[in-house]
C-alpha cells in the first residue's frame, strides 16, 4: 500500500543510480536563490548604467576626503607657496633686485618640481585604487554570475507547469544541468537581465516623456 502511494508521486533518477532507485523531486521553489539571482542582476545593471569610471572617480573623491593624506596636504601647501613666490617674483625687478629675484626663481622652480613629484605619486596611488575598484566590480558582477552558474548549476529556481511547454523549450530553460521541467540559474539570469533591460527602457521612456510634457507646458504661450 505504501509503495502504491509513493508511485503516485513524481520521481527522478539521480546520476549513478541503478534502475528502480528513484528519489522524489522537490518542487518547492528556491525562493532565496531566486531573489539572490535577481538582486545580482539588478546590482550589475545599476553598475553598468552608472559606469565604472564614474564609480571609481566618486569613490576616489570620498576616500581622499575621509582619509587624511600627507601628500594631498603637502601639495596644497606647496601650491599656495608657489603662488605666493610667483607673485613676489613678478613684483621684483630682475635687474634692480637680481639677487632677490634669483632666490625667488630658484624657490619657485623647486616648488614646481615638488608639486610634479607629488602629482606623480598621487597618480600612481589613484591608478592602484582604480585597479582595486575595477577588480571588485568585476568580482561582484560578472564573477558573481559565474559563481552562481557553477555553484548552483543543478539547482531548480522554480518548476514550470507540467507539459506547459514543448521539450525544446523545457530543455533550454533547464540548461545546463538543472532537472528537465525546471528553470535553471543560467536561464533565470538571462530572464532577469532581459526583464531589467525592459524595465529600464520603459522607465527612461516615461521619464523622458514626462520631462517633454513639462517643458512643452512651460513654453506653451498663454491665450488671452
Swiss-Prot record:
It is found in: Endoplasmic reticulum membrane; Golgi apparatus membrane. GO terms for biological process: tail-anchored membrane protein insertion into ER membrane; vesicle-mediated transport. Component of the Golgi to ER traffic (GET) complex, which is composed of GET1, GET2 and GET3. Within the complex, GET1 and GET2 form a heterotetramer which is stabilized by phosphatidylinositol binding and which binds to the GET3 homodimer. Keywords: Coiled coil, Endoplasmic reticulum, ER-Golgi transport, Golgi apparatus, Membrane, Transmembrane, Transmembrane helix, Transport. Residues 54-137, 200-224 are cytoplasmic. One of its GO terms (molecular function) is protein-membrane adaptor activity. The chain crosses the membrane at residues 34-53, 138-158, 183-199. One of its GO terms (cellular component) is GET complex. Required for the post-translational delivery of tail-anchored (TA) proteins to the endoplasmic reticulum. Together with GET2, acts as a membrane receptor for soluble GET3, which recognizes and selectively binds the transmembrane domain of TA proteins in the cytosol. The GET complex cooperates with the HDEL receptor ERD2 to mediate the ATP-dependent retrieval of resident ER proteins that contain a C-terminal H-D-E-L retention signal from the Golgi to the ER. Residues 102-124 form a coiled coil. Residues 1-33, 159-182 are lumenal. Gene3D superfamilies: Helix hairpin bin. Disulfide bonds: none annotated. It is a multi-pass membrane protein. Belongs to the WRB/GET1 family. InterPro entries: Get1 (IPR028945), Get1_fungi (IPR027538), Helix_hairpin_bin_sf (IPR029012). This is Golgi to ER traffic protein 1.
Amino acid at each position: 500500500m505504501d509503495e502504491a502511494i509513493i508511485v503516485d508521486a513524481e520521481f527522478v533518477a539521480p546520476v549513478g543510480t541503478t534502475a528502480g532507485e528513484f528519489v522524489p523531486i522537490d518542487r518547492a521553489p528556491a525562493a532565496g536563490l531566486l531573489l539572490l539571482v535577481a538582486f545580482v542582476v539588478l546590482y550589475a545593471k545599476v553598475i553598468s548604467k552608472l559606469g565604472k569610471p564614474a564609480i571609481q572617480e566618486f569613490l576616489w573623491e570620498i576616500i581622499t576626503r575621509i582619509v587624511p593624506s600627507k601628500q594631498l596636504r603637502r601639495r596644497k601647501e606647496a601650491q599656495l607657496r608657489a603662488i605666493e613666490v610667483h607673485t613676489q617674483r613678478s613684483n621684483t625687478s630682475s635687474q634692480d633686485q637680481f639677487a632677490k629675484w634669483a632666490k625667488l626663481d630658484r624657490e619657485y622652480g623647486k616648488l614646481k618640481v615638488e608639486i610634479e613629484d607629488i602629482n606623480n605619486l598621487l597618480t600612481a596611488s589613484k591608478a592602484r585604487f582604480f585597479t582595486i575598484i575595477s577588480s571588485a566590480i568585476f568580482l561582484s558582477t560578472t564573477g558573481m554570475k559565474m559563481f552562481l552558474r557553477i555553484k548552483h548549476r543543478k539547482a531548480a529556481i522554480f518548476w514550470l507547469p507540467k507539459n506547459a511547454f514543448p521539450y525544446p523549450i523545457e530543455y533550454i530553460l533547464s540548461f545546463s544541468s538543472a532537472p528537465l521541467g525546471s528553470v535553471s540559474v543560467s536561464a533565470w539570469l538571462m530572464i532577469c537581465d532581459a526583464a531589467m533591460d525592459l524595465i529600464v527602457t520603459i522607465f527612461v521612456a516615461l521619464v523622458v516623456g514626462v520631462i517633454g510634457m513639462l517643458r512643452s507646458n512651460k513654453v506653451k504661450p498663454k491665450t488671452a
